[in-house]
Amino acid sequence: METADMVKVAVSAAPYSIDKPYSYLVPESLAAAAVPGVRVMVPFGRGNKESEGLILTRVQEPKLPGSKAIRQILDPEPVLDKAGIDLALWMRGRYFCTVFEAVKTILPAGLWYGLREIWSLAMEPETARSAAVGIPGAWQVLDLLEKQGGKADIRVLRDALGDGAEKPLKAMKKAEILTCETDAKRKIADKSHRMVELAVNTEDAYALTEPKRRSAPARYEVVNFLATAGRTPAAEVSYYTGASSRTLKTMEKAGLIAFSEEEELRVPSLDDVEPGPEIVLNEEQQRAFEEILGRVQAAKPSVTLLHGVTGSGKTQVYLRLVQETLALGKTAMVLVPEIVLTPQMMRKFSSYFGSRVAMLHSSLKMTERYDQWKRIRRGEVDVVLGTRSALFAPLKNLGLIIMDEEQEGSYQSENVPRYDAREVAKYLCVREKAALVFGSATPTVETAWAAEQGNYQKALLRRRYNENALPEVLIADLRQEILNGNPGLISTPLRQELEKNLAAGEQSILFLNRRGSSRMLLCGECGYVPQCPRCSTAMTYHSANGRLMCHYCGHSEPAADTCPECGGWMKHVGAGTQKVEEELRELFPEAGILRVDADTTAGGHEEILQTFERERVPILLGTQMVAKGLDFENVTLVGVLSADISLYVDNYRAAERTFSLLTQVVGRAGRGGKTGRAVIQTYTPGNDVIRCAARQDYDAFYESEIRMRRLRRYPPFADLFTVTVSGTEEGRVLRAAVSVRETLRQLCRRPELAAGEPEVLGPAPAPVVKVNNRFRYRCTLVGKNDKATREMLAWLQKDFAKDSANRGMNLFVDHNAAD
């Protein structure tokens, strides 16, 4: 059989159920440009609709009857190299996504194409009308096309004609009255400005313009200016010489000057940053730095947990590691969990590395992200700093990845592909023979376990950098506050501490923990929270049916009005930051108060925090974004308004997250030369997690938590795969989820899976059962994250999509989901 020059293409239109590399012929006219990593337009499916794709590889294959050819090359050069393509293929196998979904995650949004379907007349209008006789609705389409000049975007046709456009369009295309083409347009174009320079040497330019200096003074002024300034933007030449654009064009025609285009990069600006002082490490920091640097120098893959108490100076260690990594001729990535932390960290790193640092996160303008990507790709950047998406920056010769606050759930994507940045970072370090550093005061239980087992290295920072003691912590019992006649949001101990700070001119941070607040029941007298008898997680209250439900195993029971432990009244817990702010203003009418929460814009976060630091505003109130990473030397008091809310949510990580959050927020106090204090308000003052956090005792928390995880087969002792079914009809979704559970149980009996002792739980409603008018039910598979399990789940997802009984419903798989 005859072989042909072909390419394997990842096609954007292919859903996960049929996703694979598709073979396409390479026309001779496109042969030179059809290389791996460029995007193409290809016909796809029975209707040969044009779709975007990415060339994965070029091969010689048998030319089969009906083979299709690529139609258009979209990129002048590859947007992904082999390493990027390999990463996309790895993500497909790991995170149950298509190759093209992985590609879109890796590339900046500014590189994406928008596809437009353009319908055009294939003949003269009158001829078209004659040919369209007998086609219902054809004349309305033809009238509209004539008004649009003979062609129109499908969206224009649908807006005008509604659903009635589809049938006549298809019929007229079949009759060759109309043609349909797909136009691809980049979402963001490169920006450039027009430059001007002399096209002849200076002496000749003066010789040509000096004689006409009186009659054409502008020409002489242009020559005089360019002779001094050299190549200059055309707008500046006009501004300084008064020459019009017409004058410049005349000079170009005369051969005096030449125009050219120069790229203009749109880079996010920072205020002027002063050079940073010399970094001096203490003995503990120096030891940790030398240990990790040795692994960077060894050029072998490694993972190190840098476990340091809050305020121990992990950032100084990061800076020194990056300095030495760059001295070795390598590059570095530094990841932070929250966008709000990026500008503060960026200023620190810019003070040492200047313009060789690039910042990447989702709140940058699309144009800025795209231009930062270009700088990185060209090798103009040595250090990339940003949130989890910064992992996909095309850095060459990577030597170091630092993941600060590695315990944060924001390192796990909630959108397809549902990737875990920690896993992607480990993949990159293996590929690049680089060192990975997980930095945290409260590492995840899985990370601490891996270090304990010797799978990761470990470096410890047990003391604060400034030698200050950790903050003194007072636990305020909210049950007693109610009994004492104070039902408000600010307890008496916290109010008294705030008064002390106001009198001393020191600052305070108040943290409101809002996660899960609207779904929690709690006894206001004894602190009892209803828990699932099987899963040891708090149950979620559903107001629609007045029941409590476990979102792991599906256990359900009526929600009681009174506490089964003490007979007290059960109450819904949760208040917003605005309500807290109102109470604060009543208590302290003269005090300045700033509020930062999810309603604050991304740029507003930074502005508020800078105002808090610069103007020493007495009180900062906020949610998650004030809990970590912030470093203000005049903050001596931290108040946690409700410690219980994140502790009693239906997630196996609830205790870990609460301990981490409390430890982090308490650690914001006393970071300058003054002693810090903290007040933790709670309905359950005897809870071990809250007591451990108050003592900043990670070891005690870890020992307790690891015992519970082992008993319940939670990570790291097993993996949890969440299989979610969604659709618009709740009954159908629930029946499909029951069917999925039975299929899973049958599949898990296979020998290659049974060895991992898999267990299938559910179905149960998702924590938020209805989103965008779609109901969601899920099963949980407890087992091993190995190749056999992933292949089985991939098959299940594809089989579900192919079954016509499941039309209108979706199934997706998540691994150790954050929620």
Regions found by a protein language model. Give the residues of each.
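Accessory, non-ATPase domains that flank or precede helicase/AAA+ motor cores in DNA-metabolism machines
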Residues: 1-440, 447, 452-468, 782, ...
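Residues at beta-strand starts and edge strands
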Residues: 5, 20, 38, 330, ...
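Short, intrinsically disordered low-complexity segments
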Residues: 39, 60, 756-787
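Generic structural signal for residues in well-ordered beta-strands
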Residues: 178, 257, 357, 475, ...
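Inter-lobe coupling/hinge segments of SF2-like helicase ATPases
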Residues: 272-282, 286-293, 299-734, 767, ...
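Short helix-capping segments at alpha-helix termini
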Residues: 353, 588, 747-753, 803-804
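Short beta-strand elements
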Residues: 593-594, 747-766, 807-815
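Extracytoplasmic/periplasmic
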Residues: 731-746
